[in-house]
Amino acid sequence: MKGYLWGGASVVLVTVAQLVLKWGMMNIPLLSLADINVQFLTMYFVQLASVMCGLMGYALSMLCWFFALRYLPLNRAYPLLSLSYALVYLGAVLLPWFNEPATLLKTLGAGFILLGIWLINIKPIKAS
């Protein structure tokens, strides 16, 4: 059970990190390193902080993942990472600032990912 908690924490952190990174990068103009100055840093502080928080989220997710691997067999742990694909899709569709459309095919794809994770992680039926 401990391994699944660590794995779940890793999935949540990587999902939030991906969404926060996307928001930050959507709101920072494309520019070169020569364009970065104090005015730019103050003008886009929230967006840059969002990107930094996303990167820290990835690092914390990796730390949680190390603990998940310690307690779970790899063939059960690794598919848990796929949860983030479905959760990021859900976040991108539901959160208004991303404005991404939900389509039947994308939703079915996310559903199949969840079904696959469930099939891999269910307890086998013992023959009597």
From Swiss-Prot:
GO terms for molecular function: carbohydrate derivative transmembrane transporter activity; transmembrane transporter activity. Pathway: Bacterial outer membrane biogenesis; lipopolysaccharide biosynthesis. GO terms for biological process: lipid A biosynthetic process; lipopolysaccharide biosynthetic process; transmembrane transport. Its main location: membrane. Signal peptide: none annotated. It is a multi-pass membrane protein. One of its GO terms (cellular component) is plasma membrane. The chain crosses the membrane at residues 11-31, 48-68, 78-98, 102-122. It is found in: Cell inner membrane. It comes from the Bacteria. Keywords: Cell inner membrane, Cell membrane, Lipid A biosynthesis, Lipid biosynthesis, Lipid metabolism, Lipopolysaccharide biosynthesis, Membrane, Transmembrane, Transmembrane helix, Transport. Residues 32-47, 99-101 are periplasmic. Residues 1-10, 69-77, 123-128 are cytoplasmic. Heterodimer of ArnE and ArnF. Belongs to the ArnF family. Translocates 4-amino-4-deoxy-L-arabinose-phosphoundecaprenol (alpha-L-Ara4N-phosphoundecaprenol) from the cytoplasmic to the periplasmic side of the inner membrane. This is Probable 4-amino-4-deoxy-L-arabinose-phosphoundecaprenol flippase subunit ArnF. It comes from Yersinia pestis. The gene is arnF.
